Amino acid sequence: MSIFTPTNQIRLTNVAVVRMKRAGKRFEIACYKNKVVGWRSGVEKDLDEVLQTHSVFVNVSKGQVAKKEDLISAFGTDDQTEICKQILTKGEVQVSDKERHTQLEQMFRDIATIVADKCVNPETKRPYTVILIERAMKDIHYSVKPNKSTKQQALEVIKQLKEKMKIERAHMRLRFILPVNEGKKLKEKLKPLIKVIESEDYGQQLEIVCLIDPGCFREVDELIKKETKGKGSLEVLSLKDVEEGDEKFE
């Protein structure tokens, strides 16, 4: 894969370049295409799957390797693997206009897919299609931010779409099983976090089936654990308040 020419040059092909400017100098690393995003999102954890070589360059396309003294001056070390990690995490990915356009289009689709998966029409309780969400995103002129995760941007899109259409995050259906002694008192504390109580069953234990906003799940879970000292249980029944067989809303 690598052809060594003079000792300070390494030739590489099919490269994604990540660049960082430091101490007035330019430093670059050579990565495999489509691997940088995986590393930054935490999906890819094996550095060797991301880097084509652990060398630090001043110019990847020309194969010019950075000098040891320049690395020490800029990074305080000549440990090239550690420097590669810094550049990989904080550097700027160099892509062609065509590649950038393709990446932004893919991110746009990914954001729309997340929104469609997480949301429903509050009146019909039915989900929207990805195509309809994409159309709505274009109508509000949503601009993809390449340095923010698709999940973060999906939340932004939901907020903006709420101003233009009937949309809300799908409710999460939960079942609580609580000790009777603490159950009634705990139910009052849970009420502000519950959207709808679908059923209550008082027997040897208090069993409640309800709908909540997914954003409240952690708070509900922690409250039950704390108040029941681990004796209560929480079960996720479904992630969407949608009946099986509902058609998607075009």
Swiss-Prot record:
One of its GO terms (molecular function) is rRNA binding. It is found in: Cytoplasm; Nucleus, Nucleolus; Nucleus, Nucleoplasm; Cytoplasm, Cytoskeleton, Spindle. Its main location: cytoplasm. The modification N-acetylserine is found at residue 2. The keyword Nucleus applies. The modification Phosphoserine is found at residue 238. GO terms for cellular component: cytoplasm; cytosol; nucleolus; nucleoplasm; spindle pole. The keyword Acetylation applies. Keywords: Acetylation, Cytoplasm, Cytoskeleton, Nucleus, Phosphoprotein, Ribosome biogenesis. GO terms for biological process: bone marrow development; bone mineralization; cytosolic ribosome assembly; hematopoietic progenitor cell differentiation; inner cell mass cell proliferation; leukocyte chemotaxis; mitotic spindle organization; rRNA processing. PROSITE patterns: UPF0023. Associates with the 60S ribosomal subunit. Interacts with NPM1, RPA1 and PRKDC. May interact with NIP7. Interacts with CLN3. Required for the assembly of mature ribosomes and ribosome biogenesis. Together with EFL1, triggers the GTP-dependent release of EIF6 from 60S pre-ribosomes in the cytoplasm, thereby activating ribosomes for translation competence by allowing 80S ribosome assembly and facilitating EIF6 recycling to the nucleus, where it is required for 60S rRNA processing and nuclear export. Required for normal levels of protein synthesis. May play a role in cellular stress resistance. May play a role in cellular response to DNA damage. May play a role in cell proliferation. Belongs to the SDO1/SBDS family. This is Ribosome maturation protein SBDS. It comes from Bos taurus. The lineage of its organism: Eukaryota, Metazoa, Chordata, Craniata, Vertebrata.
